[in-house]
């Protein structure tokens, strides 16, 4: 990697995120500065391609306005540089980034995407992502952020809530709510109970935080073991912002080892688990190399025919 530039979207204290219109405006406002910062590292580099996330997932109907900001910037840069602009999805970017230094073996795998906007278990077979399960209401990251904000922590609350959780004790007070043979889950009931604990003020903040991470680990462990039993796939790659938590990694690994010892659970680097452009860049590089290989074959066959 030559350079990596990031800037969190500013969220006012007490709020649990941004509306789409606010997020689009903030992306449009912040992207030029990030590109200027990035350009300082590229003085001796030749840019051969650009890649951008065009939509959240692989499905054609998948759409969020905020992705138009990055896609527009990418296409504009590519046009000015006269290089190809490749498109991918936010979810594929997460999975690709999580592969870096994860130790995941080549072949089929189960991919788990856990964030504030996604809680899904998918199979990745022959480069095809297929949805197997997920949440039926709240996302894992929403539970973390709503708990943290209610406790007076900044948004995004993950790192701050984890600091509390490592000092707390869990007694599995939040029941796991599963559906469809364990492939799908409900998290809204647990979040309601957490808000009740916070309002009552009778339970230590550290224990509340620990109960949240314990619940998420138990839930994800059940989902991946159910997916493994359905598909026969024995390796799992967990990506997304929630997966950057060291505590969550330890808990879900321990839980899964007890439930299904032959299931290998892998994570990427913590810094590549949350939102980042590393996976998107790797996808763009691969697509460019594939394009170049096709050109060589085409030119080679043309020369042979002469």
Identify the residue ranges that each predicted region occupies:
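A short helix-loop
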Residues: 1, 106-107, 112-115, 120-203, ...
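N-terminal beta-alpha supersecondary unit
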Residues: 1-52, 56-59
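Phosphate- and other anionic-substrate recognition elements at nucleic-acid/protein interfaces
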Residues: 34-35, 44-46, 55-85
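Short glycine-rich phosphate-binding loop at a beta-alpha junction
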Residues: 44-55, 231-242, 266
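Conserved phosphate-binding catalytic cores of ATP/NTP-utilizing and phosphoryl-transfer enzymes
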Residues: 83-110, 283
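Glycine-rich phosphate-binding/hydrolytic loop that grips phosphoryl groups
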Residues: 94-97, 268-306
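A contiguous, well-structured pocket-lining segment that forms one wall/lid of small-molecule binding clefts
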Residues: 163-236, 242-257, 285-291
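Conserved phosphate-binding/catalytic loops in two-lobed NTP-binding clefts
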Residues: 236, 253-280
């Amino acid at each position: 990697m030559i350079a990596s530039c990031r800037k969190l979207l500013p969220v006012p204290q007490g709020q649990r995120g941004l509306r789409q219109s606010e997020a689009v405006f903030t992306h449009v406002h912040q992207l030029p500065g990030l590109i200027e910062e990035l350009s300082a590292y590229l003085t001796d580099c030749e840019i051969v391609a650009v890649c951008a996330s065009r939509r959240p997932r692989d499905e054609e109907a998948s759409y969020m306005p905020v992705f138009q900001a990055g896609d527009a910037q990418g296409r504009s840069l590519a046009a000015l540089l006269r290089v190809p602009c490749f498109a991918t999805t936010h979810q594929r970017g997460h999975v690709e980034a999580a592969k870096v230094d994860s130790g995941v073996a080549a072949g089929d795998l189960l991919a788990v995407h856990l964030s504030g906007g996604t809680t899904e278990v998918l199979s990745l077979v022959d480069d095809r992502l297929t949805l197997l399960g997920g949440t039926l209401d709240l996302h894992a990251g929403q539970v973390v952020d709503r708990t943290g904000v209610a406790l007076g922590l900044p948004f995004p609350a993950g790192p701050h809530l984890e600091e509390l959780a490592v000092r707390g004790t869990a007694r599995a007070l939040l029941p796991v709510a599963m559906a469809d043979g364990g492939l799908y889950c409900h998290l809204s009931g647990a979040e309601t109970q957490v808000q009740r604990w916070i309002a009552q003020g009778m339970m230590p903040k550290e224990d509340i935080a620990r109960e949240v991470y314990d619940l998420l680990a138990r839930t994800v462990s059940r989902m991946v073991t159910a997916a493994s039993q359905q598909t026969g796939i024995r390796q799992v790659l967990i990506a997304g912002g929630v997966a950057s938590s060291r505590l969550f990694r330890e808990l879900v690994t321990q839980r899964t080892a007890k439930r299904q010892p032959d299931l290998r659970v892998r994570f990427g680097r913590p810094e590549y688990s949350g939102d980042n452009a590393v996976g998107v860049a790797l996808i763009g590089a691969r697509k460019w190399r594939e394009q170049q290989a096709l050109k060589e074959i085409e030119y080679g066959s043309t020369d042979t025919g002469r």
